[in-house]
């Protein structure tokens, strides 16, 4: 009888663990959920700083040796090259960007994001929209801040 009660007790503990683990993973204070929220917020911050023309703050979003590869353009390697490219392009308040996140994976201090992007900009008398897919790799700095390490944006037929 004692063995039976012990088995029932252990079985109950196992069942409780099975039930509790998913709720712990979904909890609002779960570090992964917090990181995902921070990363999604960075997409909005990028657009805000792009519109602001504050190139120094804009560049604070990138790692020192970041790589940016834009559709049909040579890769930009390092902050200096990225800044040189964006310096004359940012500050356009009438540009809008939307991200449709398809996948966000976090592995310790690295986050990988795949998203469809839509960039709206004025062209002559109308608004043009360019769509594509982004692969963005974020690295967490020593200060705990997520920074863009790799940003690859390409036009894709399913994002128009």
Segments from the language model and where they lie:
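Short, solvent-exposed loop/turn segments at secondary-structure boundaries
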Residues: 71-73, 124-127
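Short beta-strand edge/turn micro-motifs at domain boundaries
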Residues: 131-159
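A short gly/proline-enriched turn/hairpin at secondary-structure junctions
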Residues: 67-77, 88-94
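Solvent-exposed loop/turn segments at secondary-structure junctions
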Residues: 73-75, 119-120, 154-157
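Bacterial N-terminal signal peptides that target proteins for export
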Residues: 1-12
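Short, low-complexity N-terminal intrinsically disordered segments enriched in polar/charged residues
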Residues: 14-61, 160
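Surface-exposed, charged secondary-structure patches
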Residues: 87-124
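Hydrophobic pocket/interface hotspot
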Residues: 46, 58-59, 66, 78, ...
